[in-house]
């Protein structure tokens, strides 16, 4: 599939014949929401562990969503992953950018789930 082109319904049917990928999107949304709950008030060790889990999930979701034609979800997931990685290198920097990227990803997941 050329970069930037969404897959067609026929291509999606070949990739996801039983249509269960949207269930994964919903499950990933729920996990991200749980990881984010009270994240910034959690003890530092717990916060770091949860951010690492969120980063890994964002990476996996970014790749899978792109494969299944959810390009906006893929882009938002990779943006969240990148922001978490940058923050790790900066130490205890402001969290607003991570919160913004997470909100954007959750929004694209909601939109994708409504459309499918």
Identify the residue ranges that each predicted region occupies.
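Glycine-rich, flexible loop segments associated with nucleotide phosphate handling
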Residues: 46-55, 93-101
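Residue-level signal for short amphipathic helical patches enriched in basic/charged
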Residues: 24, 42, 68-71, 90
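Residue-level detector of functional hotspots within protein domains
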Residues: 11, 40, 56
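Helix-loop segments that flank and shape redox-cofactor active sites
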Residues: 34-52
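Amphipathic, coiled-coil-like alpha-helical segments
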Residues: 1-36, 87-116
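A short, mixed-charge helix-start or loop-turn motif at secondary-structure junctions
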Residues: 11-14, 43-47, 62
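Extended, amphipathic alpha-helices with heptad-repeat/coiled-coil or helix-bundle character
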Residues: 48-86
């Amino acid at each position: 599939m050329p970069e930037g082109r969404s897959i067609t319904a026929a291509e999606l049917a070949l990739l996801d014949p039983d249509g269960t990928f949207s269930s994964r999107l919903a499950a990933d949304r729920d996990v991200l929401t749980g990881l984010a709950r009270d994240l910034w008030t959690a003890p530092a060790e717990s916060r770091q562990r949860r951010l690492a889990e969120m980063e890994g999930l964002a990476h996996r979701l970014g790749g899978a969503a792109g494969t299944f034609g959810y390009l906006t979800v893929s882009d938002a997931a990779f943006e969240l992953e990148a922001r978490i990685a940058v923050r790790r290198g900066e130490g205890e920097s402001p969290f607003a950018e991570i919160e913004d990227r997470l909100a954007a990803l959750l929004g694209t997941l909601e939109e994708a789930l409504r459309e499918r």
